[in-house]
Each structure stands twice: as structure tokens, then as C-alpha cells.
Amino acid sequence: MEREFFGIEQASVGMGILCHRNFDNELANGVVITKNLYRPDYRGFVINAQYGETSVVIPPDSVLCEQVICYSDKNDSFLGNKSIVEYLSYSNMLPKGMNSVLRDDEIVQLTRDISVIKQRFYQRKGITGPYYDYGLDLEFKIVGTNRTIYLKQIRPFND
């Protein structure tokens, strides 16, 4: 009835469900936006990460998360010579002796994996706007002594 009232076609409505396992003993968690939030039409992924299980999206008062912008080469690959990682802020929750939430190799791996996902979403959805302005919003976890990266969920980013 509500859809009919607002003129929404029943056949145009989609619904999904996301199920994943619980992640015990998270070493880190974070969010990636696959577009440059600070310079439209420029390359760059914005990564916000936090040590442990503390929320990145709604952190407790006085908690700062690590924020990184990853710039990549013309192929959107972190494997080229022109990759740059720029730290905008560091977590204030790091234990002594730890300099950052994410290691460089984790940033490279995360960026490599997410670049592939972004290209597939962009092509499959038939997006007409510029590739660099198309964003996905991804959540990730780093778990275990070997620091395995899990992509928890992916959805289109809404400005």
C-alpha cells in the first residue's frame, strides 16, 4: 500500500539480505570509499581504519581513527611506481610500539582487491558518469595472527 501511495512500481523494488560470520578478536576494522572525497575527478580511495573492534563510523567521544588516501597509477593498481599513501590522521588507540592500524602491504592488498571490485560494479551497472567519481562503500575486518583481510559488505556510496 505504501509503495502504491508513493507511485513505486512493485516490480522495481529489490531486497537483499547479508549474512556473515561473527568476527571474534578483530585486530582492525574499517571502511573504504572508492572515490576521492576531497578532489572530485581524481584518483584515490579513502580508507578509515581503527585498531580492534572500536567503531569507525560512530566512534566514542575523543577517539580518532586512522584516515588514509591511496593514490594509484593510471591503471588504478597499487603495483605501479606511482602509488602514494597519504596519512591524514592516525588512530589514538594504538598500543605502544605500533605506528599505524594498517601496514603498507595491507593497504596494497586492500586497494588491489577493491580496484577489481569497483571496475566490475562500474561495468556491470552501466554507470554513465566518470569512473573516478563512482564510489563504493566497503567495510572490512582484519582478523587473526596472520592478519587476514575480510571484506564484510559492499554497497554503492551515496554522496
Where in the sequence are the language-model features?
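Conserved mixed alpha/beta core segments that line enzyme active sites in large multi-domain catalysts
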Residues: 1-159
